[in-house]
């Protein structure tokens, strides 16, 4: 096996707001896990390995197998391996980590938490593509959606804040970071989401195009003499923010450039906001109303301009108004809507690690 050199690997741990990082050279995932466990003891995070009650693994894709997080066994690993072609960059590495922990801590429950499973409650009318049906039967071509752990977490937290059962609420969750996806959550279940077979679909993002006419791929292949694979890479890595404002894919840099009069930075930000509003309107109609709109992730939590601009576009159709002073606060749990608002607007900082930990406790039956 090829050693993972220091430039590509770093040992990072966080505890109670503290963060330490050091470059290391390791041979493989097993070495990485052994080193991590050693560090946990050295830093007195645990006194011995017996104190570790469970391990949670963020895994990208479970195909259509698991509507919930699952205890990792040889059987569940084999099922996930069978859909590796749906997540070729992430799934194999995710499973190497699972196997390494199962070997290092054989008596401890390992729980797989999937980015896609929260969205498996969608109806066929929402997740199917109008392409030859056999593509779905043979290859699983359909909408899967991503960021599921985040959408699930903020839905639970919003219900808690509103002091209502999640099963009684219609929510639109807006996960807006370098990757962006929205989900329509009706009575506790996802009924639609913006990302598709891959995370490329939906809203324009930091480096991704979002939804485009699929014929663009063939058109550019012929015009630029490129392969479909090359164009796919450009749509994933060189589009969105970076496709317009060539200097950065960071929303903060684009806001600064916009303020300085950069027309393309201004345009792509407005395109993104419009697309978010389009989806919110669509989900409102599909769910027959909405009780709360939730912003989360880097942009959702820390970009007041984005929140304001989206809500301003929703004022006329839905009567949404937010407290502009409160909206200037970044990175905190906020209720931005007026007290008597029919549709609440919340900022809920996401915490995927906590959601994973909760699932480990629940699925692993840890008291």
Regions found by a protein language model. Give the residues of each.
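Glycine-rich beta-strand-to-loop/alpha-helix junction loops that act as flexible
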Residues: 57-60, 176-178, 290, 294-302
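Phosphate/pyrophosphate-binding loops at sites that engage ATP/ADP/AMP, CoA/4′-phosphopantetheine
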Residues: 39-53, 158-165, 280-291
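Adenine-nucleotide phosphate-binding core of ATP-dependent small-molecule kinases
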Residues: 233, 240-244, 251-286
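Internal helix-turn-beta structural module
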Residues: 266, 270-286, 291, 300-366
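Single conserved hydrophobic/aromatic residue that forms the stacking wall/gate
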Residues: 2-9, 13
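Short beta-strand-loop/turn "lid" adjacent to the catalytic site in phosphate-handling enzymes
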Residues: 40-90, 109-111, 117-126
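Catalytic phosphate/nucleotide-handling subdomain of diverse soluble enzymes
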Residues: 186, 192-224, 233, 297-328
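Glycine-rich phosphate-binding loop of actin/hexokinase-like ATP-binding domains
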Residues: 118-223
């Amino acid at each position: 096996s090829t050693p993972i050199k220091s430039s590509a690997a770093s040992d990072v741990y966080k505890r109670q707001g503290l963060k330490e990082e050091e470059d290391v050279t390791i041979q493989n995932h097993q070495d990485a896990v052994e080193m991590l466990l050693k560090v946990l003891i050295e830093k007195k995070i645990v006194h011995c390995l017996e104190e570790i009650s469970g391990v949670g693994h963020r895994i990208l894709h479970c195909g259509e197998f698991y509507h919930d997080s699952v205890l990792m066994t040889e059987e569940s690993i084999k099922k996930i391996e069978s859909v590796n072609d749906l997540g070729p960059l992430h799934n194999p590495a995710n499973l190497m980590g699972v196997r390494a922990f199962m070997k290092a801590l054989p008596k401890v429950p390992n729980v797989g938490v999937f980015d896609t499973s929260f969205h498996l409650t969608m109806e066929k009318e929402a997740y199917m593509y109008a392409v030859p049906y056999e593509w779905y039967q043979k290859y699983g071509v359909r909408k899967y959606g991503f960021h599921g752990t985040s959408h699930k977490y903020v839905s639970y937290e919003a219900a808690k804040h509103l002091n209502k059962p999640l099963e009684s609420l219609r929510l639109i969750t807006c996960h807006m970071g370098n990757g962006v996806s929205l989900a329509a959550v009706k009575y506790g279940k996802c009924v639609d989401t913006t990302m598709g077979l891959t995370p490329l679909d939906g809203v324009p993002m930091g480096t991704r195009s979002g939804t485009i006419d699929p014929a663009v791929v063939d058109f550019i292949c012929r015009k630029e003499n490129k392969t479909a694979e090359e164009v796919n890479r450009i749509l994933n890595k060189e589009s969105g923010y970076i496709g317009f404002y060539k200097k950065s894919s960071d929303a903060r840099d684009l806001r600064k450039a916009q303020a300085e009069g950069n027309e393309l930075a201004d345009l792509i930000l407005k395109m993104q906001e419009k697309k978010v509003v389009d989806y919110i309107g669509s989900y409102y109609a599909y769910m027959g109303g909405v009780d709360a709109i939730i912003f989360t992730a880097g942009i959702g939590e820390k970009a007041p301009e984005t929140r304001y601009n989206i809500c301003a576009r929703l004022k006329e159709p839905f009567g949404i108004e937010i407290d502009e002073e409160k909206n200037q606060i970044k990175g905190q749990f906020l209720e931005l809507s007026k007290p008597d608002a029919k549709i609440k607007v919340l900022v809920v900082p996401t915490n995927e690690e906590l959601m994973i930990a909760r699932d480990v406790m629940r699925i692993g039956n840890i008291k």
